[in-house]
Amino acid sequence: MKKFKHSGALGDLIYSLPIVQHLGGGEFYLHLNQMAWIGQHYYGALPNPFHQGRMTTKDYDYMQSFMLAQPYISAFDTMNPEREITHNLDRFRPSFVGHPTNYIDLYAQTFNIETTLSDKPWLTAPNPTPEHPVVINRTERWIPTTPGPVWHALKQKGLEKQSIFVGLRHEYIKFQGDTGWDVPWIETPTMLDLANVIAGAETFIGNQSSALALAIGLGVPHIHCEARTDMPLDRNECYFPKMTNVVYF
């Protein structure tokens, strides 16, 4: 039985799951409270404010039902020092420091996997909720000071009237203020709740986040990603050019 471990954050972990699936699955362990150490060890500073204090037992509880819904995950638990691990997914971190490519390809390179894994979905949501055709999540990380013209263009196409927003309440308030979109907010207490809402959508719109990772992993038919602009697109960790359902703006 293979035993995998990861320290987070949420999106990093979600993008590691194609490796777990490709290797036949197994048990998965979350290494808690490592974000500050990771920031200091690999970047010489604390992690960005949105990751500080994360990957605690609260995050584990949030993830648990979603992780166990994946057919290739036989168990999901927290890491302890006595736990034997066969595949340490945190091994990707030294190569990730320079942001050379997307997460999935980097994980594959780390584990010497030559098969292309970054061209297809890898996640399951057991109970998709199809009543929300357009799902939006826009966090406060890696967004421009002023939203680009694509938001206005999508609004002109009528997507606003079909949309709901998922994420934190303060993100929702900021999104409405930034874009002028007036859409309902749907609370999703667990990652599985969030995945079920996203899985039922025809379109996902959002920036770099765990919700975007879910949308890509679930294979939502149309994904509009508001990409970070502080580096070339082809070095963006969430850039998957072989996934034709994803466009970047």
Question: Which residues are covered by each model-predicted region?
Answer:
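Catalytic machinery of carbohydrate-active enzymes
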Residues: M1-F249
